[in-house]
Amino acid sequence: MSVNVNRSVSDQFYRYKMPRLIAKVEGKGNGIKTVIVNMVDVAKALNRPPTYPTKYFGCELGAQTQFDVKNDRYIVNGSHEANKLQDMLDGFIKKFVLCPECENPETDLHVNPKKQTIGNSCKACGYRGMLDTHHKLCTFILKNPPENSDSGTGKKEKEKKNRKGKDKENGSVSSSETPPPPPPPNEINPPPHTMEEEEDDDWGEDTTEEAQRRRMDEISDHAKVLTLSDDLERTIEERVNILFDFVKKKKEEGVIDSSDKEIVAEAERLDVKAMGPLVLTEVLFNEKIREQIKKYRRHFLRFCHNNKKAQRYLLHGLECVVAMHQAQLISKIPHILKEMYDADLLEEEVIISWSEKASKKYVSKELAKEIRVKAEPFIKWLKEAEEESSGGEEEDEDENIEVVYSKAASVPKVETVKSDNKDDDIDIDAI
């Protein structure tokens, strides 16, 4: 039976599957051990050597591990249940397999033993970063890098040269049954011109339209998108800059008002949709931000609707705008937040969470704190309104119960309940 590689995803049609871990306990007493029967298959699904998850179990359990690569036996000392190991495998997948950006298990590890670093690159979204090497398993990985690691490039080049030499030799022998006599020692026999052309053809084949079309037929639709878009191979900062130039150009051309769909499509193409509000605030907002919130509400709503991450970037963008127009905007923070809240660009939870911690990532620490101090009246109002609404919900539940029971009662009783509801509504508005 197969399970999702990322078990936090409950979709039964999730494309990334792996076999469920099968563990077999062998031996007795001090010699008891757990053999992971299908570790090779599990590791293949994760695109990692089978020694990595086995060693991870040993690190987490404080147990010794044994690897019998020839017989495909991977052993953890002690008695351990399969379900326990399966849950522990989720930790390994999260730390060493899933991409931190898109959470897809399409990553490769790049080990540099000299610098003692382990890089991580994602083939799905183009993410590149470094792993935290504090885990004990990282020491094992640095000593035993995977075969596809950059540390093995020298070995690969040698194999490539050897292959190339063999191809030349095979080509020269195939022309006749007996090889030609060797040239005199003082003469150098250059390779025939036809062979050079063949080699050039081999190297140039990748760039021809026919070769590209043939390769495109062999790869999946998802990989097609990545291959066709070179921009996805760039860093996040470069992709955000591309989006910034795109939005700025639309504004300069005077078509920004009707370009909301195009801007969202471009952000999705670059895989930086959550950061879209940060770009929009920089291009579209100035000291007249309160008027501009209403004018460009549709643009921001396409990014921020039901997207808390995008809403957080909108708040960070607001901080940047305040930093540029501090004299005009610092006193208007509560009103600006209220405008954004009323426009459904921000949710209560996101605003309250933002107000609790000042960050110096986008503006200075002092300004970030000052902005939050100025926002306190609105935050206080927001919290009080939330408490009142929760209290009102409880009252509504009681009223609903009254109405349900009043169906069995006489008509005058139902009318009385309705009149009470109206009075309650008036009281809530007054509050």
Swiss-Prot record:
SMART domains: eIF2B_5, eIF5C. GO terms for biological process: formation of cytoplasmic translation initiation complex; regulation of translational initiation; ribosome assembly. It comes from the Eukaryota. The record marks R15 as: Arginine finger. Residues 153-170 have a biased composition (Basic and acidic residues). Belongs to the eIF-2-beta/eIF-5 family. This is Eukaryotic translation initiation factor 5. The lineage of its organism: Eukaryota, Metazoa, Chordata, Craniata, Vertebrata.
